[in-house]
Amino acid sequence: GKSYFSKIAGEVENPQSAGALLRSPFEFAQHGQSGMWVSEVMPHFAQCVDEVVMIRSMFTTSITHEPALFNIHSGRLFPGHPSLGAWVSYGLGSESQSLPAYVVLEDSKGPPINRNQNWQSGYLPPVCQGTRFRSTGAPVLDLHPGKDVPDQMIDLERDLIGELDRIHLGRRPHQPSLGARIANYELAARMQIEASEALDLSKESLATKAMYGIGEDKTDSYGRRCLIARRLVERGVRFVQLFIDGQIWDNHTSLKSGLQGAC
């Protein structure tokens, strides 16, 4: 994650250096009615600090990427435990019959460290895990049949597969992953229209797109995913998670220029 000391905290005392000050390269000022300290590198965030909740009590006992990502998603340092989105999906379900309860929007530049283990369901039913959507092009790969296949043939094929699935599941009642897989296929059929509509930003106004930074080189990709996330929530998705380019905050060197470029 981004450096807390260079973005939010201001000057702090380093207990490892016998009282010496570890100063951020950025200047800080208080903002909003809350008086939250925010550095100069986040001018837009500084304007809306009273609209966010700042959690200052979080910490990790790991210094490496993989366990830290497991920790922030599931509260544990190792894989195999449900992610936060999976718990929300398990507890609340989905308000939509045509969209998953938990959707993941990855960065177009590539998946995050740990990949799909970040949104796993662990020991909860597999249906609670995140469903990955793409923010450009087809939201879900291979969701639509070939153009030359008649609709009537698609319906007959779907009914036949559904009947075979029910027979197969009846012979294996103690395999929850099988039931989840069948449910995912049924959901995929319903998603063919709903998912494409949710990711279609063409009907959004120019003013709305501008608010999300769509059309600007540095903000277009993430802004599109933010707007898509809002549209998914409006359509009943309970939990939407956005990932950003790989290790953009991994500033081992060139802290000042690295953070400024990332922000």
Model-predicted regions and their roles:
Residues G1-C263:
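Ligand-binding pockets and gating/stacking loops
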